């Protein structure tokens, strides 16, 4: 399917679904940007769809999963639902948690600016590739299945998505709000570091600009869902399934997946430390033991960055 605008100053955006389940891309144009000819569509396993996006456009794309729509096109999605009750989002934004691809085309010096953001959480692996442009045109995104590494307190939709710490706890220090609304005051948290370790080129928190925003000039773009594997599974060990339109509530997951790796071990170590820091650790230990354990755990965590 090719959706076109008139005029030559446009970029071709191609959406590719390498997941082993359908994905429903959602589209939201930024303030002052013209709406595209679609705001949402279904992308079956193995399919690709393209559309033209005019110069000067800004907005975001995301993938919805676990969707169920009836014969009249009414329904909802288990993750990243846009609230329209339809396949087309019609100006609706992605409900967190959602992996977001964000673009500003033809900005400063005619450059395109783009990023993949986990600030609103994560639901699907996603990669942006710039094609045929000039400049660095770095590929960016998150290829890791963060649902398998998601701390239990951040899990949503039965393990099909992973909340940000801001969404989960609402604290100003996690949301970079109030007194923390500046780069100097809002620093990476242990939770955002889990996201950053797994996806180094993605935004992990609100002020993660330096290593997360990229530029290209005159390029076309490919947005790929599940780029690394034909079978991306949730933390429950099964692929996302379509849900009934009346069932899109977020449900806390149980335990971690059966697979284990160093990154996942680090994630759960950091999760325990974060709980301890905010007083939610499930363990009650003498202060001397806590001190020794905390020292060892922090040392182990820091070694992962060396």
Model-derived features: positions:
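Extracellular low-complexity, O-glycosylation-prone Ser/Thr/Pro/Gly-rich "stalks"
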Residues: 1-306
């Amino acid at each position: 399917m090719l959706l076109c605008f008139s005029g030559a100053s446009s970029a071709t955006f191609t959406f590719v679904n390498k997941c082993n389940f359908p994905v429903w891309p959602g589209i939201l144009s930024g303030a002052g940007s013209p709406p595209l000819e679609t705001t949402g569509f279904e992308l079956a396993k193995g399919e690709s769809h393209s559309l033209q996006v005019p110069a000067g456009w800004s907005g975001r794309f995301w993938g919805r999963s676990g969707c169920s729509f009836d014969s009249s096109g009414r329904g909802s999605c288990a993750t990243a639902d846009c609230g329209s009750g339809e396949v087309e989002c019609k100006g609706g934004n992605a409900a967190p948690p959602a992996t977001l691809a964000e673009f500003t085309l033809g900005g400063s010096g005619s450059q395109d600016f783009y990023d993949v953001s986990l600030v609103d959480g994560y639901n699907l692996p996603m990669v942006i590739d710039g094609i045929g442009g000039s400049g660095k045109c770095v590929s960016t995104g998150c290829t890791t299945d963060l649902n398998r590494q998601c701390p239990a307190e951040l899990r949503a939709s039965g393990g099909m998505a992973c909340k940000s710490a801001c969404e989960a706890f609402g604290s100003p220090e996690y949301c970079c709000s109030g007194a923390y609304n500046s780069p100097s005051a809002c620093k990476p948290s242990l939770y955002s570091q889990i996201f950053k370790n797994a996806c180094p080129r993605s935004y992990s928190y609100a002020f993660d600009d330096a290593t997360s925003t990229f530029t290209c000039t005159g390029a076309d773009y490919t947005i790929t869902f599940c780029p690394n594997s034909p079978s991306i599974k949730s933390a429950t060990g099964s692929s996302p399934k379509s849900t009934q339109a009346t069932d899109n509530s977020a449900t806390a997951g149980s335990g971690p997946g059966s697979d284990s790796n160093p990154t996942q071990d680090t994630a759960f170590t950091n999760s325990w430390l974060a709980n301890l820091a905010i007083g939610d650790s499930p363990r009650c230990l003498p202060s001397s033991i806590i001190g020794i354990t905390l020292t060892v755990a922090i040392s182990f965590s820091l070694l992962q960055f060396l």
